[in-house]
Amino acid sequence: MRNWLVLLCPCVLGAALHLWLRLRSPPPACASGAGPADQLALFPQWKSTHYDVVVGVLSARNNHELRNVIRSTWMRHLLQHPTLSQRVLVKFIIGAHGCEVPVEDREDPYSCKLLNITNPVLNQEIEAFSLSEDTSSGLPEDRVVSVSFRVLYPIVITSLGVFYDANDVGFQRNITVKLYQAEQEEALFIARFSPPSCGVQVNKLWYKPVEQFILPESFEGTIVWESQDLHGLVSRNLHKVTVNDGGGVLRVITAGEGALPHEFLEGVEGVAGGFIYTIQEGDALLHNLHSRPQRLIDHIRNLHEEDALLKEESSIYDDIVFVDVVDTYRNVPAKLLNFYRWTVETTSFNLLLKTDDDCYIDLEAVFNRIVQKNLDGPNFWWGNFRLNWAVDRTGKWQELEYPSPAYPAFACGSGYVISKDIVKWLASNSGRLKTYQGEDVSMGIWMAAIGPKRYQDSLWLCEKTCETGMLSSPQYSPWELTELWKLKERCGDPCRCQAR
């Protein structure tokens, strides 16, 4: 017996030492214990617990109330469940960095790009394009030329114009100039130039007045010049004209050399004339620019306070993964890829469920359906899929990087489930996968490369509605989510209570 004890003692001591070292090992980098400003570091490889499902909840930094509602509804139910509590891991996905540009000073509310207006040209008309003195007046063969632009601060276009040939005596052409709003087939206004009706000559252009509309911030338009004659237009490459942006209130949109032209361009990209515009609301613009320094100071202070609140929230609930991303709408696809990498490198799991913090989720119903339909194989994607979804070229969902008119099939973002091997593929390629305007369409484009088995299920609702048996439903306020869950707990149905 003593001999056996002598042999066993070193084993017992070794096991105890190994366990002690594990307990003292640091938490995963950028997981719940890490501060929101920490960099995403190498993840530890130790994976202590296996989970059937990892749930990733995309959440904005300031959505404290939505996260708390989730913690008090379906997450609380999950943690109190006798079996599911050990089978599911739920994490909120939050960008470690807030945007350092105040919302009022961004080009749009969806990105973190500074609206860089300096020394605006106020109370006078501005020629959008001008030619240098030594520009030659060669005649290209292009009969249709167009250029696109984006308005960054409200302007009014007063005139449309065309270039003329210096060798001509007077105006000897027939040209139509149209201005379109992006993705619209009908022109906002038209100017027609002909020898008997050529307008007014200003510098090297002929101009005609047009009906005046205020073009608002974020307006995207295209000007098209079309020759009605057999010979082409007098036009220039965009690099050979001077763009007068009024101090930064508009931007010409170019495809760039060697790139595919934008879908809404007609003919050849270039300039065959110009337009005259004025800047609107000049006093308001000056006030905005003068108040920027103080606004930035206040905003940075608020960011520090937000960091502290997030760190405290994370330490209390231990359910946040901070990913090394500036937290804006345009960066949501990058947030998701970072979370996939975190999941693979820190967690042992079978399936991953992605949802948003404004969504109702019934995890018990999800598990029941997995068992009923045997939804746990490899190369597997379970959701409610949109097919032939048109690509938007303007607005919040603007997509200029994906050239096709329609996206590949993609699952609605309110909830979908993917198998572990797909998560691993996404994680291993996260540094090379191009991100597009939304995480749902980005996922569809990425998945088109590997062709997973799609399981269509309409119970992952795409729109804000309530259906008995639904697995998810999006776009709810904190109060609405609370009410849905109250009905679910009281009556077994989040949509209604049957009269007894």
Swiss-Prot record:
BP-aspect Gene Ontology terms: protein glycosylation; protein O-linked glycosylation
Tissue: Expressed in all tissues examined, but at highest levels in testis, adipose tissue, skeletal muscle and ovary.
Protein name per its UniProtKB record: UDP-GalNAc:beta-1,3-N-acetylgalactosaminyltransferase 2
Residues exposed to the Lumenal side: 24-500
Species, as recorded: Homo sapiens
Post-translational modification, as annotated: N-glycosylated.
Membrane topology listed for this record: Single-pass type II membrane protein
A single GO molecular function term of this UniProt record: acetylgalactosaminyltransferase activity
Highest taxon in the source lineage: Eukaryota
Source species taxonomy: Eukaryota, Metazoa, Chordata, Craniata, Vertebrata
